[in-house]
Amino acid sequence: LIGGAARRYTCEMQDRNLALEVVRITEAAALASARLMGRGDRKLADHVAVEAMRVAFDAMDIRGTVVIGEGERDEAPMLFIGERVGAGWRAGASDSPKVDIAVDPLEGTNLCATGAPDAISVIAIADDGQFLNAPDTYMQKIAVGPEARHVIDLRESATWNLERIAKAKGKKIQDCTAVILDRDRHSELIGEVRQAGARIRLIGDGDVSGAVMTANPDSGIDVLFGTGGAPEGVIAAAALKCVGGELQGRLRFRSDDERARAVRMGVKGEDTIYSTDELARGDVMFAATGVTKGYLLDGVRFFGDSAKTESIVMRSKTGTVRVINATHHFNTKPKYSWATGLEP
């Protein structure tokens, strides 16, 4: 009994340590990309975020496999789908946890490049084989916080869902706010939400942060509607699972090639509605660090030889949500990005 209790205690401490270690990954990416805020080069901002995150993984005691990242092996030099990350692989340590990794080193590349709010760096971690291997295509989504969990249905109209969400939260539709990506494809959706009487916050990029905001009462966001990236849908589902929220998603293919690729990956077709637990199964962890100041997190602030970051770390097993404000001293911190001109 004592031995079993000790093993359970050890596993629990490893899980807790891992939950706190993941934020170091997003901090590294945020610190690197924030140097390029407002400088108009979204590709370079994304590149340095990817580079910094990849290097930071080398110090993490895991055997991780990227299942959602920067694309296929021939499309991305780092953090490609199937890449092994973590110190555990190099050491051959069988006791290092084997996990799935879902990352977006810089969600909102355009936001960072223009200095707009809500660019973030995000990561989600689950046990091996627990994330949906979402293809790089679109996903129609609806996301809500805990109060409106189990009352939404992606098959129904936005108006129908708004009525149910408002009732669940004890408010009128006119008091509800929906966050929607500002895209031409959403013109009818935006018109319907306006006709229903709800308020709208249009965002240029970043529906992961939009989905997470539905679970934060201080954000004023009640629901996310619309179609965005399928990989981002899995990451957002992991985040909402940690706090008791809900995301439903349905794949939307843009071409026959995308449809065929999904079949090869073993993913179900466009008629399937994926629940939160189908997108992110088991115990999951989520972390995000702000790059630019936003509604979800504060951005990176530089002070010559140091910088401050704000991050959020969540874990589904315990429901714990931690907000971490950190000060980073560049004269002692590892250098995660070697991109020209980014030295502090």
Label every model-predicted segment.
Residues M78-F80, A113-A116, A134-T137, L189-R194, ...:
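Short acidic, glycine/serine/threonine-rich loops at helix termini
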Residues V122-I203, M265-G266, G294-Y295, G299-R301, ...:
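Acidic beta-strand-loop-alpha-helix segment within the catalytic core
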Residues G204, M213-D218, V223-P344:
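Helical "lid/coupling" subdomains associated with nucleotide-phosphate turnover
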Residues V66-E70, I101-V103, C112-T114, N133-A134, ...:
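General beta-strand structural signal in soluble alpha/beta enzymes
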Residues D58-A59, V85-S96, D104, C112-A116, ...:
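Solvent-exposed alpha-helices and their adjacent loops that cap or buttress functional pockets
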